């Protein structure tokens, strides 16, 4: 009976308090699949070709979070480069675009430092850089060339939840909405074009995390 009591007390200690805490001063990293789903639109020539479309893409997502207090966190979202196909209803796929959207968030975690489940919300800023953008053969056949996109700054919002498995490990899910507005610069028949493009994606991530 004494051994059982000792074991029960040890288990209670393990399952309570800081055993599951997101605590002030703590740092943790999450990793998992992150999917970018644009809610796209375009102006100019691209906008008049009907059905402007940017494909979804999934890459490895990483988040790095520092807890300033038991409830306030600061998070950086990073990922391997996303690759999107761009097209219109009139032309089909015409180009491939690569981008990186690092996003810095200020977060509020609900509950307290003894909670195993920590829902959270966040607001912050997104910076998106575009690179290795090119028209495919289909785009080139229509007289398109020299594609580039202007880097973008915009606001971002987030909701998510962490489930704390033990003192070191957690699993989580998070959704971001990002304001990504850019300008597509290209030539059509040798004439320079500048079209406004709105990506404004939803980003979904399921992750496993480790706390340091």
Swiss-Prot record:
Lineage top rank: taxon: Bacteria
Look up the record and give one Gene Ontology term from the biological process aspect. transmembrane transport
The places in or outside the cell where this protein is found are: Cell outer membrane
Q: One Pfam family from the UniProt entry?
A: OmpW
Signal peptide from the UniProt entry: 1-21
* Record key words, sorted: Cell outer membrane, Membrane, Signal, Transmembrane, Transmembrane beta strand
| Coiled-coil ranges (or none) | none
> Which SUPFAM superfamilies does the record match to this protein?
OMPA-like
Disulfide topology? none
User: One cellular component GO annotation, for this chain's record?
Assistant: cell outer membrane
Question: Which NCBIfam families does this chain map to?
Answer: PRK10959.1
Q: Which PANTHER family match?
A: OUTER MEMBRANE PROTEIN W, PTHR36920
Family, according to the entry, reads as follows: Belongs to the OmpW/AlkL family.
Protein name stated in the entry = Outer membrane protein W
């Amino acid at each position: 009976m004494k051994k059982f009591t000792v074991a029960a007390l040890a288990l209670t200690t393990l399952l309570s308090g800081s055993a599951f805490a997101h605590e002030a001063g703590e740092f943790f990293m999450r990793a998992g699949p992150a999917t970018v789903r644009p809610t796209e639109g375009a102006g100019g020539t691209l906008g008049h070709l009907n059905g402007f479309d940017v494909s979804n893409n999934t890459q490895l997502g990483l988040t790095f979070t520092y807890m300033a207090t038991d409830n306030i966190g600061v998070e950086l979202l990073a990922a391997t480069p996303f690759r999107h196909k761009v097209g219109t209803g009139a032309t089909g796929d015409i180009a491939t675009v690569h981008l990186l959207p690092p996003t810095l968030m200020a977060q509020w975690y609900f509950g307290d430092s003894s909670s195993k489940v920590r829902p959270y919300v966040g607001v912050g800023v997104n910076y998106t850089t575009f690179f290795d953008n090119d028209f495919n053969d289909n785009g080139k056949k229509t007289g398109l060339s020299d594609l580039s996109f202007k880097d973008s700054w915009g606001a971002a919002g987030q909701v998510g939840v962490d489930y704390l498995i033990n003192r070191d490990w957690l699993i989580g899910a998070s959704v971001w909405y990002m304001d990504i507005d850019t300008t597509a610069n290209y030539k059509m028949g040798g004439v320079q074009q500048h079209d406004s493009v709105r990506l404004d994606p939803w980003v979904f991530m399921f992750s496993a995390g480790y706390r340091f």
